[in-house]
Amino acid sequence: MKDEAGERDREVSSLNSKLLSLQLDIKNLHDVCKRQRKTLQDNQLCMEEAMNSSHDKKQAQALAFEESEVEFGSSKQCHLRQLQQLKKKLLVLQQELEFHTEELQTSYYSLRQYQSILEKQTSDLVLLHHHCKLKEDEVILYEEEMGNHNENTGEKLHLAQEQLALAGDKIASLERSLNLYRDKYQSSLSNIELLECQVKMLQGELGGIMGQEPENKGDHSKVRIYTSPCMIQEHQETQKRLSEVWQKVSQQDDLIQELRNKLACSNALVLEREKALIKLQADFASCTATHRYPPSSSEECEDIKKILKHLQEQKDSQCLHVEEYQNLVKDLRVELEAVSEQKRNIMKDMMKLELDLHGLREETSAHIERKDKDITILQCRLQELQLEFTETQKLTLKKDKFLQEKDEMLQELEKKLTQVQNSLLKKEKELEKQQCMATELEMTVKEAKQDKSKEAECKALQAEVQKLKNSLEEAKQQERLAAQQAAQCKEEAALAGCHLEDTQRKLQKGLLLDKQKADTIQELQRELQMLQKESSMAEKEQTSNRKRVEELSLELSEALRKLENSDKEKRQLQKTVAEQDMKMNDMLDRIKHQHREQGSIKCKLEEDLQEATKLLEDKREQLKKSKEHEKLMEGELEALRQEFKKKDKTLKENSRKLEEENENLRAELQCCSTQLESSLNKYNTSQQVIQDLNKEIALQKESLMSLQAQLDKALQKEKHYLQTTITKEAYDALSRKSAACQDDLTQALEKLNHVTSETKSLQQSLTQTQEKKAQLEEEIIAYEERMKKLNTELRKLRGFHQESELEVHAFDKKLEEMSCQVLQWQKQHQNDLKMLAAKEEQLREFQEEMAALKENLLEDDKEPCCLPQWSVPKDTCRLYRGNDQIMTNLEQWAKQQKVANEKLGNQLREQVKYIAKLSGEKDHLHSVMVHLQQENKKLKKEIEEKKMKAENTRLCTKALGPSRTESTQREKVCGTLGWKGLPQDMGQRMDLTKYIGMPHCPGSSYC
């Protein structure tokens, strides 16, 4: 915001400066208008005075005319002349008035335009001022909000630290109370390990986050360090370029001054030469006037010859001077071109500097935007962290309440445990008393058995014994219930301890997270302060850079003005040089006209002959070059054909290799599919084994139920035998059998536990195999997709190969056509050579004729000029016509040869382009083949990895096989055990009912 305000202040200052400059321009225009009005008023006064004077003069002249018409006739004519001059002056003044009025109107319109522009700019300035004030108010409000926000965050941090200290004290007290329970509850170790793994994961994530934050810090510092030296270097470079531009401008000014001096000297020389020419022309005219008639004597002829020689010498010297002037003009033109090139280079440098300035401005704006974005991101991060901190505080409060509730529950459970233990002790004492009573009663029963006379008392005692047994059974049932309740209470206590430890760990984690968040908040606040400082430093640098940029822009504008002035001066100089060139050319045309008339015929003939010989030599060289080029092209074509053949072979080999690799991949896929099928079969067999195990478990349950029924029957029989008073020997046998049954039951229960553990392990292995199966199916799908892609790419490659083969065939056809064309061109070339030989013979004949004609001309020159003058021009005309025909024929033939050679060159260029195209397509095909080979290698590696994984899974399944066989063997042993003696076993059935009623099997799912 501050940067925008500064930029707008600078724009306002620039607009104010522009306004002041416009006001000064308007004042200057007003002054000019006032001056022009004053001049117009002065002109009008002069006109009025002249009119008044002329009117007075007319009146005086009329009076004088009336008085003396004869004396002042001549004065009348003078007055009329003066009147005409005055009228002319009036017309001129009127034209000047009209011109000045037009200028005033244009200046008035321009003033109006400037006023409208000023009004627009003033309105824009007012809007900008208003916008700047609004932005300043927004910045002040934003700073106040940031200050309040920082104060609130500081207060919240202090409160959070106090709350954290209180929570730490509470946690210390809880840790002291929980250290007592750690020795009792070791079953929570597995949960602790899982939670430790989660803590490690979270610590890793926190470490990653903390690592990202210093990296971001380092990036900010790097950007800050990088931007300032880059800006300084760029400003230094711009200053250096400006100094170079000023040096070039000063050099151009010096060159322009030197050129002006040279032009002044050349103008002076030209004026002198013109004067000398005028004098010579006058002398020549006087000579021709004096010497019209033929000379009468030999002396006069000699004098005339001397004068002519002198004139020729003067003419030669003038020609030399003219050539020197031409050379000077050429040098001036070269210097002007160099100056123009320097100016263009300077303009290019200026444009580059302007582009660099624009780039610097864009970079500064982008850097400011980046910093603003970083500040906004950090502010959002601060807000998010504050919200997370408040949420963690709420969670800690909830956890504290939950811990208090858990403590209360634990205290209540401990009280209940103590009560249950007391009741159990009481019941144990009662059981001991009842056992003592039972032993006493048994003793009495034995005594009663010995005494047959006391049967009635025995019956009564037996009834009492049954009652006592019933009471014992009830007491044992109560004990079982109490034991179950105690076990439940212990389990609840263990769960409560686990929950307490979990809550403790969560609290510790929350405290660590709170500390980390507080540290991150402090670090972010420090970063904010650092960023604010950096932004202030960057703003200062930007202000200094903008000032420098403004200074540089002013210097650029001054340099551009100077360049425009130099352009104007250059144009003026070019105009003057062009005028002088025109004058010099006119002079040269006048001087060299006679020479051209005399030596044009000879020069033309000699030049034509030389050109014809040169053309013939050039054609021969071109023919030799074309032959060599044709040979080279044929060699290149043969090399290209060989390369195409080799590449076709390589493409075919690569396609074969790709097909072989695809076949290998398909075979590997089939192997994978067979492995999958085998794993599925194993999975089905394992499921069948599990079903068999479940059936066997159900059978064992049924056998247990039957055992329970047999035990009930045995109990009933025991009661019956007790009623009928069976002998002691039968009772002992039944007790032995019951002990054996009890041992068998314990073994069966152990086997059941073992079977259940094995079933669990089998279920786990089943889940693992299912997961592996899903992974293998996904991999198979991915392989199928890869195969599809490879097949599509192979098809594309085959299509490319077919296209390349078709192109090669087409290229071969074109080569054949080109070879045919080359043969035709060779034939044409031979025909052309024959034509050239014939034309060379004609040229020789023409040269011989020309030599003979020259000899005849020399002889005619030697002979006296007594022949009539009309015969010579006829011979020369015939010679000219013959030479013109020869030259036209030669030119036509040369043009035809040029056209044919151009066609050949174009065709050869097209062939070279087509060859380059084919080589590019060849490179593309080669890159595609390399890419496909790399993909095939990757697929092979992946298939090998999958094979290794499949072998590992096979080894695992093989390792699981013997365990399953052992479990089945154990089940068979359990099934073949002798369960037949159970209904005959009697004795200690009360202990068996304990195991049957509540088989305490840890880890069994069928309890």
Swiss-Prot record:
InterPro entries: PMF1-bd (IPR037391). Signal peptide: none annotated. Its main location: other. Keywords: Cell projection, Cilium, Coiled coil, Disease variant, Flagellum. Residues 76-103, 157-203, 322-717, 759-793, 829-863, 922-956 form a coiled coil. GO terms for biological process: gene expression; protein localization; protein-containing complex assembly; regulation of protein localization; spermatid development; spermatogenesis. It is found in: Cell projection, Cilium, Flagellum. GO terms for cellular component: cytoplasm; sperm flagellum; sperm head; sperm head-tail coupling apparatus. Required for normal spermatogenesis. It functions as a scaffold protein that attaches the sperm head-tail connecting piece to the nuclear envelope, thus maintaining sperm head and tail integrity. May also be involved in the general organization of cellular cytoskeleton. It is linked to Spermatogenic failure 31: An autosomal recessive infertility disorder caused by spermatogenesis defects that result in oligozoospermia with a high proportion of acephalic sperm. This is Polyamine-modulated factor 1-binding protein 1. It comes from Homo sapiens. The gene is PMFBP1.
